[in-house]
A protein has these predicted regions:
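Acidic catalytic motifs of isoprenoid enzymes
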Residues: 1-190, 197, 201-239, 244-258, ...
């Protein structure tokens, strides 16, 4: 369940940059308040996107406050007190916990085995709390894991079939961010399904050599591609096609807030994640001095 969606910094306006950073700090502080300091390191940029999408589709204007950032002494401007931010914090905890289960202990190096053991010990309480707060979301992740096991046992050669579990869970996850409008929910489910398929293919392509060496199921290995470079090129080609499909559904959304920021993330940011638009764009500093 990996894969990050973040803005494409070279094309981001200062206003949108500030909005994004305030949401990032807001989600991190929500995780700190609800689940403890250690849980904050689970935050990935997907959670920030979930919060922005949820609030923007519903037209919820967040409260902006200057509060202390977890792990820092200084106070920064951040967004708070919205349903989208609370949903994002819950999602990051549950998704982070299930990511810990993705690889077997036997496949990890000793240092990573120790790190996983510490994570599972210290994050257990946060996971249990998030699961109780949002049992429906926990069921989504559990179903995805069960479907993934079935696909591994089948050793499916069909790319769409192999990506189906992750595509389904992302589709269901994104549909929860929509309002009660059935058309909006349908569009968000399709967008999430495309994103899940994109990140599944890219993740499997990057793990081509490791999975082949460890005898783990990998759809690119089953299709006998000639090395990791060929797998990555194949994954990028399929992912770009999924991005084009996603764009048609995304353009149908009625965004009430943050439309330019979301356009940057969903169009340029996603394309950059699939096929880098500019060298070293990811090494840009996020915090303006």
């Amino acid at each position: 369940m990996k894969g990050r969606m973040r803005p494409y910094l070279p094309e981001l306006t200062i206003r949108d940059y500030n909005t994004y950073m305030r949401y990032l700090r807001g989600v991190r502080r929500q995780m700190y308040k609800s689940y403890g300091f250690y849980a904050c390191h689970l935050l990935r940029t997907n959670g920030v996107l979930f919060a922005i999408l949820s609030d923007s589709l519903a037209g919820r204007m967040p409260t902006r406050k200057r509060q202390r950032v977890p792990g820092m002494l200084c106070r920064r401007s951040m967004m708070c007190q919205t349903l989208g931010i609370r949903q994002a914090a819950q999602t990051e905890i549950l998704m982070g916990w299930h990511n810990l289960q993705d690889r077997k202990y036997s496949e990890l190096r000793p240092a990573k085995r120790v790190r996983r053991a510490v994570d599972k010990l210290l994050l257990r309480r946060a996971y249990d709390k998030a699961r109780q707060e949002n049992p429906a979301l926990e069921r989504l992740f559990a179903q995805e894991r069960e479907q993934a096991v079935v696909q591994m046992n089948l050793s499916a050669k069909n790319y769409a079939l192999a990506a189906e579990p992750m595509s389904n869970v992302y589709g269901a996850l994104y549909s929860t961010l929509a309002t009660d409008d059935p058309n909006q929910r349908k569009s968000m489910r399709y967008i999430g399904s495309c994103i899940g398929r994109i990140f599944y293919l890219l993740d499997k392509a990057e793990r081509f050599e490791a999975d082949r060496r460890n005898g783990q199921y990998n759809v690119f290995v089953v299709n006998e591609l000639n090395g990791q470079a060929a797998a990555i090129e194949n994954a990028r080609r399929q992912a770009l096609a999924a991005v084009n499909d996603l764009m048609r559904a995304y353009k149908m959304l009625d965004l009430k807030l943050n439309d330019t920021l979301l356009n940057n993330i969903m169009i340029l940011g996603l394309q950059h994640a699939v096929y880098p638009l500019e060298q070293d764009a990811d090494t840009e500093k996020w915090e303006i001095p």
